[in-house]
Amino acid sequence: LICIAPLTNIGLLFAMDPKIPSLLKRIVLMCGSPTYTRYDGTSETMSAMDKSDLIVLGSKGVIENNALIDPHATKLVYGAEVKEHVTCGLNVTSRLIMKPEEAEKIFHHPLLEPVLDIAREWFKDEERVTFHDPLTAVSLFHEDVCRFERGKLEIETDSRLLSGFTYWRPDENGPHRVAMDVDKELFYQYLFEVFR
């Protein structure tokens, strides 16, 4: 199962039938921001591990949108007993950025024209497109595109200000595998080779 949006429907499904998670071979999610890294030239990196670490409050992108929209469903999904729990969060997806002129050159296949149309709308506000969901889809078929670490992700639901925040704790016996790095060149190769 691949999840690239807020987890309301999946959380509801799991709540309605708690046996469903155990029937899944794997769940791959674009969700959360397991670690926080600034890509503005300061090279500041911090782990998002401690509830007392409130410096992240003012940092853009620390709470990922899918988790923010429905933190309770997100918590339920991450707590479900799935055979394999895989996450690609903002810590890796935000590294896959393309400028408008690059997209115009690359998105020339007929199947990509609707994607380019959507990207053009995005460019009106952002001047870039970020490949959040495509990385999640590519990693489903090509796990070598990311370096994963095992651990435990917990979702904040008690704090009004931090609702949806993801707490990451590395643990070799943990239930979650989280992408910590991405091979950009390999990602673009896998993504676009299907359109040749």
Outline where the language-model segments fall.
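Active-site histidine-anchored catalytic micro-motif
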Residues: L1-T87, T93
